[in-house]
């Protein structure tokens, strides 16, 4: 564990979280083992109907990706077969964390890449498994088999609850929070730095200079 802990609140469906990847690599390169990272899954939606009720469509999703290309990550905007929820993908990341601590980061990045460059549906277990089979040392089938395990469900719910503790935080003052399903939550990719008696919050997407 590094001398400074970094908690990242994120979700595999968020283009802002995907677009911050270059900045995260810079932080890792500059500070290395001084930083101890922890990934907390927000769980943006449990059901696709939540997105549909907000007016999301496959075409709208593809079109919205165009404005994120300027941040340097690859996007292949094409309308997906349908709108999908994010809970199953978040559970896959949590399952990876429990099965093989540390592998959750690779699983998370693989799902991010597949989300924005392929037709992947984040709530389709078969498609999630296909995306993860490309990762050496990751047992995609074992991850999928545990998506509904009690341990995974409990850990996922803890992540969701922690992500929804942003009320009154610096992130809220930065107007980098949301309230889509009850409590005020952190938006992706919020970073919380803790160490040397300080707690600093960079809410939502930020340029590398903010970190």
Positions of predicted regions on the chain:
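Extreme N-terminal starter segment of soluble prokaryotic enzymes
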Residues: 1-7
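Short pre-active-site segment immediately N-terminal to redox-active cysteine/selenocysteine motifs
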Residues: 10-13
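Short, cysteine/histidine-rich loop/knuckle motifs that typically chelate Zn2+
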Residues: 16
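Structural alpha/beta surface segment adjacent to cysteine/selenocysteine redox centers
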Residues: 19-126
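C-terminal cap of thioredoxin/glutaredoxin-like
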Residues: 20-28, 110-211
């Amino acid at each position: 564990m590094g001398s400074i802990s970094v908690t990242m609140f994120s979700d595999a469906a968020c283009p802002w979280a995907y677009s911050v990847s270059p900045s995260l690599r810079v932080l890792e390169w500059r500070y290395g083992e001084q930083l101890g990272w922890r990934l907390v899954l927000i769980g943006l939606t449990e059901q696709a109907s939540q997105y549909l009720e907000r007016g999301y469509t496959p075409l709208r999703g593809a079109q919205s990706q165009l404005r994120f290309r300027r941040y340097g990550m690859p996007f292949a905007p094409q309308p997906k077969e349908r709108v999908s929820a994010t809970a199953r993908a978040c559970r896959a990341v949590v399952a990876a964390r429990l099965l093989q601590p540390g592998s959750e980061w690779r699983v998370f990045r693989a799902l991010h890449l597949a989300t924005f460059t392929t037709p992947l549906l984040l709530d389709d277990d078969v498609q999630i498994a296909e995306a993860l089979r490309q990762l050496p040392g990751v047992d995609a089938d074992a991850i999928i088999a545990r998506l509904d395990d009690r341990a995974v469900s409990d850990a996922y719910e803890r992540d969701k609850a922690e992500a929804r503790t942003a009320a009154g935080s610096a992130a809220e003052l930065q107007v980098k929070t949301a309230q889509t399903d009850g409590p005020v939550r952190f938006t992706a990719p919020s970073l919380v730095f803790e160490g040397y008696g300080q707690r600093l919050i960079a809410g939502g997407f930020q340029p590398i200079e903010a970190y």
